[in-house]
C-alpha cells in the first residue's frame, strides 16, 4: 500500500483496524458506544531519531500490526483513508500471529 505521508524521525503511520461491530454474544454495538481502536497496521516508518549523534532505528516495520496507546498520535485523513501518526514511543507491542 502506498501512502502519501512520509513520517519524520521516530514517527510511524498506522492504519487503524476496524473496531468490533458486535459483542461475543452477537449483539450489535452502536457507533456511540464503540471504543477507539488501539490496533493497526504500520504503513510507513520514519528513519529513526538521533541520539548522541547516531541514528536509532525504529523497532517496527511496514506491515507490522501494532497495539498503540489509546490517546497517542495525531489523526490525519488522506485519499479518503484515515491514518494515525504516532511516535514510536506510543507503540506498546507488535502483534505476532
UniProtKB/Swiss-Prot annotation:
Coiled-coil parts of chain: none
The keyword Cytoplasm is assigned to this record: yes
Keywords: Chaperone, Cytoplasm
Record's keyword annotation contains Methyltransferase: no
Classification via PROSITE patterns: CHAPERONINS_CPN10 (PS00681)
Superkingdom of this protein's organism: Bacteria
Protein name (database record): Co-chaperonin GroES
Species the sequence originates in: Pseudarthrobacter chlorophenolicus (strain ATCC 700700 / DSM 12829 / CIP 107037 / JCM 12360 / KCTC 9906 / NCIMB 13794 / A6) (Arthrobacter chlorophenolicus)
Origin organism lineage: Bacteria, Bacillati, Actinomycetota, Actinomycetes, Micrococcales
Gene encoding the protein: groES
